[in-house]
Curated annotation (Swiss-Prot):
This is Proteasome subunit beta type-5. The 26S proteasome consists of a 20S proteasome core and two 19S regulatory subunits. The 20S proteasome core is a barrel-shaped complex made of 28 subunits that are arranged in four stacked rings. The two outer rings are each formed by seven alpha subunits, and the two inner rings are formed by seven beta subunits. The proteolytic activity is exerted by three beta-subunits PSMB5, PSMB6 and PSMB7. Directly interacts with POMP. Interacts with ABCB1 and TAP1. Bortezomib binds at residue 108. Its EC number is 3.4.25.1. It comes from Bos taurus (Bovine). The keyword Nucleus applies. GO terms for cellular component: centrosome; cytosol; nucleoplasm; nucleus; proteasome core complex; proteasome core complex, beta-subunit complex. The active site is at residue 60. It catalyses: Cleavage of peptide bonds with very broad specificity. It comes from the Eukaryota. It is found in: Cytoplasm; Nucleus.
Length: 263
């Protein structure tokens, strides 16, 4: 019998009931050929990996900086899903406890979940040790928690801001477990524009109103240039006696105030 005639015969493994397929022969197409081709049992060739079908683009602008009167925290309120604006009223500053604030940049669900979990861990720490957790310890807790999931698709870039026995504290933590202490940070797609304003106007000796104006101006400039940032500017001030919410200004109103300004 010729070899060609053997290869042309249909494979019996695709009959109804074999391997519990119930007649779905298409489920056992192991190779590049059709199920009736004898070559269908050959190992599949290595091809080009399939590209992700959906690419979610993250966009936001958040900032925080330390100065002699505490820590200023500001953020926009726009949430995007790819090229679509999902919301204009997202609260991107998370109130962890009366002395700690966190910001959201990256995946909204990731940031919200991990910072709310951090709030519970901070409360447990206080109950066990009978004292407030420090800003450094809180940021280290968050970094340790997310590091366990490194490489698993988390998307988070947050700033932990607060006041403890050492004074004002500011740390940047991301989903890779990185943790950095600093005086000024801006995170998000509009951060390059916010940094431009902060680098020019920031000083540790700023007065309170000057610091408020600098934060508003920095977020406004980011929303003006970055399509993924917008909505309103939420402004917080962390002081020795706890944080306060200073204001929430629509960027359209800030445009009337700052457009044409040269500084």
């Amino acid at each position: 019998m010729a070899l060609a005639s053997v290869l042309e015969r249909p494979l019996s493994v695709n009959r109804r009931g074999f391997f519990g397929l119930g007649g779905r022969a298409d489920l056992l197409d192991l190779g590049p050929g059709s199920p009736s081709d004898g070559l269908s049992l050959a190992a599949p060739s290595w091809g080009v990996p399939e590209e992700p079908r959906i690419e979610i683009l993250h966009g936001t602008t958040t900032l925080a900086f330390k100065f002699r009167h505490g820590v200023i925290v500001a953020a926009d309120s726009r949430a995007t899903a790819g090229a679509y604006i999902a919301s204009q009223t997202v609260k991107k500053v998370i109130e962890i406890n009366p002395y700690l604030l966190g910001t959201m940049a990256g995946g909204a669900a990731d940031c919200s979940f991990w910072e709310r979990l951090l709030a519970r861990q901070c409360r447990i720490y206080e109950l066990r040790n009978k004292e407030r957790i420090s800003v450094a310890a809180a940021s280290k807790l968050l970094a340790n928690m997310v590091y366990q999931y490194k490489g698993m698709g988390l998307s988070m870039g947050t700033m932990i801001c607060g006041w403890d026995k050492r004074g004002p504290g500011l740390y940047y933590v991301d989903s890779e477990g990185n943790r950095i202490s600093g005086a000024t940070f801006s995170v998000g797609s509009g951060s390059v524009y916010a940094y431009g304003v902060m680098d020019r106007g920031y000083s540790y000796d700023l007065e309170v109103e000057e610091a408020y104006d600098l934060a508003r101006r920095a977020i406004y400039q980011a929303t003006y240039r970055d399509a993924y940032s917008g909505g309103s500017v939420s402004l917080y001030h962390v002081r020795e006696d706890g944080w306060i919410r200073v204001s929430s200004d629509n960027v359209a109103d800030l445009h009337d105030k700052y457009s044409g300004s040269t500084h």
